[in-house]
């Protein structure tokens, strides 16, 4: 991974942290699942399904499912979505490429989900021409 890729990944992480501070009052964002499935909420089940799709290389399907299940009135869904995009950001470029996905799409997804929650103004935070 080159310096440019590392820079873009860090900038995406900074974008998510800025949204977390603004919308959730948190310095870091990390939607964590309970230890056992019997303790899962509906949101936990959605997140688990999304992660399973990503791990199977079905990133576009995971993103489609995210939008279908997103509740713009529940900030837990914002945290879940941002955590998912952070997870995608940690994937290497080859994995993203094999899934027909890109870092630019990560940025677009972050901005789109944020806009669903009324959070705007970050559209130019990441220079996607470097992606």
Name each model-derived stretch.
Residues 1-74, 90-131:
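N-terminal alpha-helical interaction modules that lie
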Residues 77-81:
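Short, well-ordered alpha-helical segments
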């Amino acid at each position: 991974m080159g310096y440019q890729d590392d820079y873009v990944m860090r900038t995406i992480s900074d974008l998510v942290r800025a949204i977390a501070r603004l919308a959730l009052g948190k310095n870091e964002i990390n939607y964590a699942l309970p230890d056992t499935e019997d303790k899962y909420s509906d949101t936990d089940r959605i997140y688990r399904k999304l992660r399973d799709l990503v791990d199977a290389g079905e990133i576009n399907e995971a993103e489609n499912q995210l939008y279908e299940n997103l509740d713009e009135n529940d900030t837990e869904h914002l945290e879940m979505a941002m955590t998912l995009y952070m997870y995608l950001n940690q994937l290497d470029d080859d994995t993203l490429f094999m899934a027909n996905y890109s870092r630019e799409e990560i940025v677009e997804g972050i901005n789109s989900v944020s806009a669903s929650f009324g959070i705007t103004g970050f559209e130019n935070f990441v220079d996607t021409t470097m992606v």
